[in-house]
Amino acid sequence: MKKTYQNINFDLRQLTKPFVLGLLLCSSTTFAQTNKAVIDNIMSEGTNNSQVEKLAHELLDGIGPRLVGSPQMKQANDWAVAKYKSWGIAARNEKWGEWRGWERGISHIDMVSPWVRSLEGTQLAWSPGMGKKTSVAEVIILPDLADSIAFQKWLPTAKGKFVMISMAQPTGRPDYNWQEFALKESFEKMKAQRTAQTAAWRNRIAKTGFNARTLPVALENAGAVGIITNNWSAGFGVSKIFSAYTKKVPTVDIALEDYGLLYRLAESGKKPSISMHTESKELGAVPTFNTIAEIKGTEKPDEYVMLSAHFDSWDGGTGATDNGTGTITMMEAMRLLKKYYPNPKRTILVGHWGSEEQGLNGSRAFVEDHPEIVKNLQALFNQDNGTGRVVNLAGQGFANSKDYLGRWLAAVPDTLKNRIKLDFPGKPGAGGSDFASFVAAGAPGFSLSSLSWSYGSYTWHTNRDTYDKVVFDDVKSNAMLAAIMAYMASEDPEKSSTVKAEGVKWPVQNKATRRGGLDN
């Protein structure tokens, strides 16, 4: 008879209940030699002498965003290596591929007719630069035409124009604002209109015979001087900033308020004109790196505990909560471990991954390049979903994860764990962040999942993902939690089990893209 595994969900706020306490402490006797002083010292240092604010300032303000292939990404790699070495921790940059090098310059966009207004906007990543040229031209809206034949006939009209290719949002107020103040019938009416408008705009794009990726190229080939978009992030003042698809002319995102202004003026026949000047540099193929730091194990140096956080970011903001906070969490955790646990039983590594944003490429490459580490991984702890306290930890489909994670959590002070919800054995993550690269290879990688702090709308990939959004008390707590979990995993006399739960579909291990943005 095959053994089956029941999925166990519980909340660590229930730790006073005997049956849950027993679950977490069932194997704690194996830690008779665990040094409580190490945990006490980590808590004291992490609370009273934390370096997270200093690290955040140096990374987010001093270096800024870390787009893969940009000079700032390499600057951040080198900064992290130097910082680790200043703490007495061995560190290195490991090359795993190459990417299209690009350096962002300035973006100046102004409406000059029918009246003058400086507009809030920025070029998208990898947008072609304009050199020293400034373009002044009329703004037009992508028309709603019958079909692709009609669109081809219209295309010459785009010559010499800026073309708006995004839907104008019916409201700049996020839904939570409507829920708080609007009449219910007004809110429902707005949502229905927005749904219909979104479907109609999607159909408008489809009827051109192109899609969101190919339409900008068709327009630039027809002579458009620039492409204007708005990728609203459903909050006040936020846009998501991703990649340009044009090869010759700039693509910019203009904030909802200004995009709506231009759209309404164009729609009503006022023929608005804007002046645009954007600069950027193409740098050719540049090497891409993961930054790896290491505290060598003494008893089992060929077994590994890993901390994990992607280092790259989109560049509309400064990559503060995606994933500057994960980065400084793991750097601070390593600092704490080096200071109070300098001779771990197992080797403790940290991986700061490149090109997570384009598909977990840095961590996938590491998994491919280091099978000996993947095979002998005791546990990996990853943090990548914002600045909030860790509130969720799942077993990622490993049948016995509740046993060893339970043992390690038992030593974590209640102030750090009393709001964490556990899900055992859970389901294996197929993507989303770098722990999934290890899980797909059958290695025990776990996500330290955080409170939202409106992450999805206000900071995730947005122009407002900046230092001021970091909640440092929560980051400090996460750094101490990560350090203690790494300590306990290193000390555990037992090797963690990688037996997969029955009936769980395991994700496919995907290969890293090692040459990006250069072949299209």
Task: Name each model-derived stretch.
Residues 2-19:
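Bacterial N-terminal signal peptides that target proteins for export
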Residues 17-28:
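Bacterial N-terminal signal peptides
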Residues 35-37, 57, 61-195:
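Noncatalytic luminal/extracellular "stalk/propeptide" segments of secretory-pathway proteins
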Residues 36-70, 96, 106, 234-244, ...:
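N-terminal capping segment at the start of a domain
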Residues 36-38, 127-152, 236, 241-320, ...:
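Soluble metallo-hydrolase cores and metallopeptidase-like ectodomains found primarily
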Residues 39-46, 61-71, 137-145, 151-153, ...:
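Second-shell loop/turn segments in exported
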Residues 116-118, 132, 137, 146, ...:
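Metal-dependent peptidase/peptidase-like ectodomains
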Residues 197-208, 213-216, 220-221, 226, ...:
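Active-site-adjacent substrate-binding region
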